[in-house]
């Protein structure tokens, strides 16, 4: 199983659906997701293996599971789902006027709140290394400045002081240094991990992962993974770290 690091942010989940002001000659708008009587009739698009899927199933919602939060929004846009349950930070970046989904809206339904961190192989000293880098970045203001760049500063939690402790044997940190790359498993998740116009990975998580790679003296390599397979990808060493909104209960 994966070992999850100390919390970096507090995230909540948001339900996103069609605007009720959609003209009558277009597709029928979704019902108000805040009304219990209507919730049972709705179909929610969720990312497989995510906290959103867990919450939806626990509440008895009808769900369609897809392999990314971005695709959950696509399901709503296409009319194959009434609403999507995604992380609130992503909803704020991708839903509403001036975004990729201007015809969708975020409901005021607060589903859950969670702490998230970064996932490494169980027992990996990379966890200790990343914690030390994040602690330093918090202390010198780099973490907050990066969060402000992507509008997520309100979700930051304090990073306690931490010193790196290397493993005496089977060191992941040494393994990564020897091969010269830090392979970062992600899913596309604006404003955390997404591509700019030139195809470069940017976002709060992406920039923090690049900082860790810099401190390791290696090149960062981003690879999109199936979120449901994250533990397998880690344990098989296809990736070195999962860095994309991983909840601390994973």
Walk through the language-model features, giving the residues of each.
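Hydrophobic core
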Residues: 5, 9-13
């Amino acid at each position: 199983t994966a070992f999850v690091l100390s919390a970096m942010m507090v995230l909540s989940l948001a339900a996103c659906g069609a605007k009720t002001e959609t003209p009558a000659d277009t597709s029928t708008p979704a019902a108000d997701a805040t009304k219990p009587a209507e919730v049972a009739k709705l179909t929610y698009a969720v990312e497989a293996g995510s906290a959103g899927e867990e919450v939806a199933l626990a509440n008895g919602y009808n769900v369609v599971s897809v392999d990314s939060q971005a695709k959950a929004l696509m399901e709503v846009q296409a009319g194959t789902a009434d609403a999507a349950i995604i992380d609130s930070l992503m909803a704020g970046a991708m839903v509403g006027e001036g975004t990729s989904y201007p015809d969708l809206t975020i409901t005021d339904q607060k589903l859950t709140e969670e702490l998230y961190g970064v996932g490494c192989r169980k027992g990996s000293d990379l966890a200790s290394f990343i914690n030390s880098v994040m602690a330093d970045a918090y202390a010198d203001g780099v973490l907050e400045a990066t969060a402000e760049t992507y509008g997520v500063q309100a979700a930051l939690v304090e990073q306690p002081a931490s010193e790196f402790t290397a493993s005496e044997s089977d060191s992941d940190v040494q393994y990564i240094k020897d091969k010269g790359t830090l392979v970062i498993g992600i899913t596309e998740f604006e404003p955390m991990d997404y591509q700019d116009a030139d195809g470069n990975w940017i976002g709060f998580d992406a920039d923090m992962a690049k900082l860790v790679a810099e401190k390791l003296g290696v090149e960062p390599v981003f690879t999109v993974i199936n979120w449901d397979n994250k533990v397998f990808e880690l344990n098989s060493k296809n990736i070195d770290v999962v860095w994309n909104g991983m909840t601390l209960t994973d």
